[in-house]
Amino acid sequence: MLFRSNPEAAAEVTRAVKAVTTKPVIIKLSPNVTDIVSIAKACEDAGADGISLINTLLGMRINLRTRKPVIANKMGGFSGPAIFPVAVRMVYQVANAVKIPVVGMGGVSSAEDVIEMMLAGATAVEVGAANLVNPYICRDIIRDLPEVMAKYRIENLSEIIGGVK
């Protein structure tokens, strides 16, 4: 079942998980869809406690010498700073459509990125691929946040969540 692109299937999976746990259920959404908002709303209606987005974009590379795909599956997950604008857009769209918390991720690699995600509507921000480049990236972001907040006259991060309408 390809529940990533079908609102009804995503709702069904959400309900099934909610039925077997009392813990909060946060649904991670794929960006490889035409309408992420309808999927997020279906998950919310099915009882999701939060939405997390985005996962990797589908990508592909071809070896010029062999003229074959670089990876055996032909396509795979594309992540890192290049997907950040896509992630910000989708966080903005979903945060403006649901009432549950939204966790933003996808290409986050700086304190500025954290603030941008929160302005788009993220109530929390995750760092993924940047950890592979710099295992201390989370420490660095936390260290840099006060200075960046001061630069943009932000006293408390909670005041900027969803600040862009």
Language model features: what each stretch is:
Residues 54-78:
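Histidine/lysine/aspartate-rich catalytic loop segments that bind and position anionic ligands
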Residues 20-31, 96-105:
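Short beta-strand/loop segments at the ligand-binding rim of alpha/beta enzyme cores
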Residues 18, 44-47, 118:
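Non-catalytic positions within long, well-ordered alpha-helices that form the structural scaffold/packing
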Residues 78-99, 103, 109-165:
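Alpha/beta catalytic cores of nucleotide-metabolism and tRNA/nucleoside-modifying enzymes
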Residues 1-2:
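Short, small-residue-biased leader/transition segments that mark boundaries at the very start
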Residues 10-15, 37-41, 91, 114, ...:
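Generic structural signal for well-ordered alpha-helices
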Residues 31-35, 57, 108-110, 131:
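Active-site-proximal loop/turn and secondary-structure-junction residues that shape catalytic pockets
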